A protein has these predicted regions:
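Bacterial N-terminal signal peptides
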Residues: 1-9
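Sec/Tat signal peptide C-region and signal peptidase I cleavage site
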Residues: 11-15
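Catalytic-domain carbohydrate-binding cleft regions of carbohydrate-active enzymes
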Residues: 16-366
Length: 366
């Protein structure tokens, strides 16, 4: 395991005794994480879960004027376009308004340890290309609520792709503490990659969190979570996990009440990247703790990378074939023997990246 060095201003992961005077702030990030496949087939994903996601969130966007929804995975947007074109066109209006937010930057929410650097960059490139062509926007973050560990190269790759932040909730699934007494280095800070480039890191907590029609500005748990950092800020997922859909009506109403409330917590109905943008440029915020290392899971993550070895073998063989095809195509064009088959290569990579999904390549799906 790579050595991990934690560099914190104040010297403690949570800096409990170094809270700032400012009011606690909660970035409420609505999501409906949808597995491309897991305990069901892709046909079920498209017929039930993709439909539920777009239909339910269009309803919430119409009903609640402050509701902001975040959703990741270019392949799921492509399925929306193919199978639910009327709803897709309606969704585009809310994307233009900034209320349906494109998160994650990628073609799919792939595993974050097995794929090569080339695969990572292709995944981001193809995702961003789709978002530009379809919606006229680009994503700015890595949004992986449900992956099983994150390599030290991830912040370097993200930074070189022009991205500014990363979030997940999965490290809470660790069985044993890893960073002192904690399962993660801190809840909000900077993550430094192997070349020294940094992105912002935010721990999102449980993505299936729900509330029952309360004023979240008065919520004691949000206040306590915000107090775990010297920033007095919490980044909080809420919604559903794995099967898509949407947050509950009561949860959305709780955020709406919090926005109007006068309690000790300032509520923000946030896009997945708003926190990162609020702290740019990062060099102006020396109070941000810095982590320099990898973010791994123990029991759960270990099984993902020691089983279904054949799938990992086929993955690597396809990465090598993709590299060979790219070299051959570029050489042929350079020699004026053939036109570079960009569309063919991109479509092949999309089909391949689809199988690098974090429950596919790891062997954790049926």
């Amino acid at each position: 395991m790579l050595a991990a060095t934690l560099l914190l201003s104040g010297g403690a992961s949570y800096a409990q005794g170094n809270k700032q005077e400012k009011k606690a702030k909660a970035y409420m990030v609505a999501d409906a994480h949808l597995d491309t496949q897991w305990n069901w087939d892709v046909q079920t994903t498209i017929k039930e879960y993709v439909w539920n996601t777009i239909n339910q969130n269009l309803f919430l966007l119409k009903k609640y004027p402050n509701y902001v929804f975040n959703f990741e995975g270019g392949v799921k947007y492509a399925w929306m376009k193919e199978y639910y074109p009327a709803q897709y066109e309606e969704m585009k209006k809310y994307i233009g308004e900034g209320r349906w937010h494109i998160s994650g930057s990628s073609w799919d929410a792939t595993d974050a340890l097995v794929p090569s650097t080339e695969s990572f960059i292709r995944n981001i490139m193809l995702g961003q290309q789709y978002y530009r062509q379809e919606f006229g926007v680009e994503s700015t973050d890595i949004f992986l609520p449900d992956c099983f560990g994150f390599g030290w190269t991830l912040p370097t790759i993200a930074s070189h792709c022009g991205l500014i932040g990363f979030s997940s909730q999965k490290l809470d699934w660790r069985v044993h503490p890893f960073y002192g007494k904690s399962k993660h280095p801190f809840t909000i800070g900077l993550w430094k990659g192997i070349d020294g480039s940094s992105i912002m890191l935010a721990h999102g907590y449980d993505y299936g969190r729900r509330w029952n029609d309360e004023d979240l500005s008065e919520n004691e748990q949000l206040k306590e979570l915000a107090g775990r950092t010297p920033l007095n800020t919490v980044y909080r997922y809420y919604g559903t996990g794995d099967i898509g859909g949407s947050p509950t009506l009561a949860s959305v109403r709780s955020v709406e009440k919090g926005l109007r409330g006068n309690g000790p917590v300032e509520i923000v109905s946030a896009t997945s990247d708003q926190l990162y943008k609020d702290y740019l440029p990062y060099k102006n915020h020396p109070e941000l703790p810095v982590f320099d290392g990898e973010l791994l899971m123990d029991v759960h993550g270990t099984g993902c990378y020691t089983s279904q070895a054949t799938m990992k073998l086929y993955n690597r063989q396809n990465e090598l074939l993709g590299d060979a095809a790219e070299r051959a195509a570029v050489t042929a064009e350079w020699l004026n023997q053939a036109k570079y088959p960009g569309s063919t290569i991109n479509e092949a990579w999309k089909r391949f990246i689809y199988h690098q999904f974090h429950d596919d390549l790891t062997g954790t799906s049926i």
